[in-house]
């Protein structure tokens, strides 16, 4: 062999035709015979290498078991120690990729990063103990202290941030970006969490999307939810199929399902109400268990709590309503109605003074505008019945 450098007892001692090797340390590259282009620094580094070429090993026992693996870079005590035939791996840090045997194209930076990986390929791990329990899970990216720490066979996960996807084991296709995002997720798949503690309590809930500070924070098994905004769906645990956009929107929802909410503080107090639509600042804000309500507009249906079947479209339409089965369309339509039920009001300030009157119909500008407690009234036209 030509252009070899060996420093230390038994270093490169069996080399026959290998070229351009550098071996520094007791028994480093001791069993290499024909391999070339290796750099080995440290006691027993690349000790068992025979034909593996173009490897770099720096540190005690780094790449110790490598036999035919090529183009690996190992820096740190016991980094890539058990690698035998794996190629194109990079391990930087104490015990980085220590147990890897055949896995390829992995990058591990940090103490114990990808420690337990054996045959999995295409993982990237940056941070103390990130992906350290991973064995055969492939195509994962973990950046941050203990990110994806407990992952074993889960695949195609992306975790960026301290303890993001911390205890995930077999869940796949998850994206967690932010401190503790999806921290408690174990087996659930296809979740996306972006923001501090977003979906951080989720265990088995699938296909949720949470974007924002503490969005869907306590969700555990709820599925198919979308929460965008600070504290959106923060209290949701098992509620499913909710779509929420806006700061504090639906922040108290626990088990309510099939709701659509858009606007700051809209649907804020809802806990178990289902199949509601709230669009606008404070729309349906006080609703707790009411179902089947539609509120579109600033403060629309703001005070309804437990009743359902109401439709309010317009600025402060049905704002004070606590009854059911009312329909109000227009600016201030039925604004002060409280317990009146089964009314239909369409037009600017139509039925605007109604409080407890029921079964009325008002169509037109200011229609029935003076009615307060009367029942079974009908008015059609400009200021009709006013």
Q: How should these model regions be labeled?
A:
Residues 1-386:
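Glycine- and small/polar-enriched repetitive beta-structure motifs of secreted/surface proteins
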